[in-house]
Structures are given as structure tokens and as C-alpha cells.
Amino acid sequence: MNRTKIDWCDYTWNPVWGCLTGCEYCYARKLAKRFWKQMYIKELRFQQKIANEPLRKNLAEFKPVFLQSNFNKKFPGKPSKIFVNSMSDIRWWKKHWMKRVLEKIKEYPQHTFLFLTKFPAVYEEYKFPQNCWLGVTFTGSYGEESRLEEFGYARKVRNRNLFFFSLEPFLDNYLFENYLLDIEWVIVGAQTNPYQPPKREWIEEIIKHTRKLEIKLFIKDNVYRAYPDLPVIKEFPANL
């Protein structure tokens, strides 16, 4: 299991690499461009194969591919927060991949498993164990209204799971006040490469709304790089 520099979780677990969404600011694609060859060699060794051309092509092009070597990683003994898909969006996973992942998660109720997607309707397709937190990534931009509606419906379907927003990168001041009523946690972060922090007034607005609604808020370190005098807020929901 990989320790991570992502400050709102302890480990990352990436049984799948690759995404078809095509966000221009995607950090995962940039990481994959640097490290796909190492991952390819690692997976070949695990599979005890000399070559696998479909695997090589998918890794090189950042198309979704299941990695057995990552899936089989040993989980930590101590209860931990594990981000399941930092190198993919589950919208593009094959259903049998997800079913294998969820079956494994059931074996580790002591851990909290966090998912993120830009397509919240995908949460309606599976039965997630209660120790899964289901996150939706928004940038705060206009044009995301339909996905907010999807989120509202998915939240009702999966009402036993904790839902959260990740505003990262936070690129515009589209307010989510009406939708914040349905969630327990908000993460706010800056665009990392190239670095682009959200405007200070946007952060202050999010702080105001989450305080008013008693929602936990986590402001990432990369925001304080631009605004070191902001109050340090790194909260987690009550069951952690």
C-alpha cells in the first residue's frame, strides 16, 4: 500500500490506472506519463509474462486498465483512510473490476475507503459497503448543474454512505449552498500543475457556508501556499 502526500488520506490504492474524461489539468495523466513504463514492468513481473501489448498500449495512452499487482497490495493493519482511485475515475471502470474491489473492501471494515468521480450517477450502479465514502469532484464552474442533479439523486440512493465534495481544482465561484445540505464533508484545493490557487474570496465563502451548515471542511496545504494567513481548517467527519 502506498503512503501518500495527499493530505486528506493516509494511503492510495489504485487497482485501476487510466481515465477517459480528458481534463486538461489532470495530475494523474502527468504522473502516468512519467511512470507508466515502471508500472508496465512491475505488472509483467507479477503476471510472470515477458510482454503484454494491450497492457503496454493502455498504460502508455492512459486508458483504463486493471492492475493485478496493485489490487493484491497488502492493506495496513492500523485503521486508515485509503483513497481508492487517485489514478482513475470509476466512471470508466468495467463492472467486474468494481465488483472485485468492493468484495475486497468488505474484508476490511476497519478501514475507510474513499472514492472520487466526476460522474456521480455511477454511485447508483453498485452497492457500496458502509465504510466507503463517496466523493464527487467539482471545479465550481458553471455548466456543472447536471452533475449536481446527478449527485442529489445518487445521494438519495446511497443514503447509508457518507458523501463529500472535492473542489479541486477550485476554478470558479459557482456556489453549492443548496447542495451542501446533502453532504458531510468538503475538500478544497488548488490546481497543482501549473499552480493556480482559487481566489481568496471563494475560500472565504466556502468557509462561511460550511460553518453555517455545520459541515466539516478540509482546506489542502496547496491553498495555504497562496494564503498563509487563512485559518487552518483540516476537519474530518465525526466517525473518523
Give, region by region, the residue ranges found by the protein language model.
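C-terminal accessory extensions appended to soluble enzyme cores
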Residues: 223-240
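Compositionally biased, intrinsically disordered low-complexity regions enriched in proline and serine
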Residues: 26-28, 41, 109, 180, ...
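N-terminal [4Fe-4S]-dependent radical SAM core
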Residues: 1-81
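Conserved AdoMet/S-adenosylmethionine-binding subsite of the radical SAM
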Residues: 58-225
